[in-house]
Amino acid sequence: MNNLPVVRSPWRIVILLLGFTFLYAPMLMLVIYSFNSSKLVTVWAGWSTRWYGELLRDDAMMSAVGLSLTIAACAATAAAILGTIAAVVLVRFGRFRGSNGFAFMITAPLVMPDVITGLSLLLLFVALAHAIGWPADRGMLTIWLAHVTFCTAYVAVVISSRLRELDRSIEEAAMDLGATPLKVFFVITLPMIMPAIISGWLLAFTLSLDDLVIASFVSGPGATTLPMLVFSSVRMGVNPEINALATLILGAVGIVGFIAWYLMARAEKQRIRDIQRARRG
């Protein structure tokens, strides 16, 4: 097989730098202006941490942050559990009656517009409230259910791709030695797909934290998430507190992302060492 020649051109570096600049320059400007002492977000008036203090004293903003983080963590956890079960059914159970319909229902939220999803869930909750009296009020619970609905699809796709790459001979060898399918899953399969589960959890957490459209449909008067509060604030003018909040979120995402990358890299190295040790043994 002939390998195609690698074209080394300085333009590749230029294009790469332009791409990174386009992606990260706005974030850098946001971080810089979060330390601006002026009330006008576009006018520089000197360095100050004033808006971080104002942010911490803003009860409405802190309440929205707490609500969004709680919903995102709970939705990501539920989506990780349901997505793992769905992925195992899709990959390990093979063809069964209704498998195509099951796969379609799992992946449908990936291509469904948020407006349609939000409106359909709103109609569902209203119909349930009239039929059985639940939910009596729309709020944190309805937002959580809505987020689990679409986050599960993303988690299932991530874990399914990982399951298809696994060497099934390891699982078959364990069952030949007398292990039950349930024990094989928890002792062998689950540790091997754990990096994918963590990735799916982080993806679901990000999607839930970032959602505005669906939450706007299914939320109630007493439940205002962070994207909803930020959107309403921006419509009346950009508040410098938003720059400070965005900077804190960027820092938190960077730290969590690094920790997740480190844990997954260490788990992957350990998995490779275990496989090599088993083959030598």
From Swiss-Prot:
Keywords per UniProt: Cell inner membrane, Cell membrane, Membrane, Transmembrane, Transmembrane helix, Transport
Pfam families: BPD_transp_1
One GO CC term on file: ATP-binding cassette (ABC) transporter complex, substrate-binding subunit-containing
Activity regulation remarks: Transport is feedback inhibited by intracellular polyamines.
Topology, Cytoplasmic side: 1-13, 89-115, 161-186, 264-281
A single BP term in Gene Ontology: transmembrane transport
Source taxon at top rank: Bacteria
Protein's membrane topology: Multi-pass membrane protein
Record-annotated membrane-spanning stretches: 14-33, 69-88, 116-135, 141-160, 187-206, 244-263
Subcellular location: Cell inner membrane
Annotated family: Belongs to the binding-protein-dependent transport system permease family. CysTW subfamily.
Subunit-structure text: The complex is composed of two ATP-binding proteins (PotG), two transmembrane proteins (PotH and PotI) and a solute-binding protein (PotF).
Annotated protein name in UniProt: Putrescine transport system permease protein PotI
Native source organism of the sequence: Escherichia coli (strain K12)
Lineage: Bacteria, Pseudomonadati, Pseudomonadota, Gammaproteobacteria, Enterobacterales
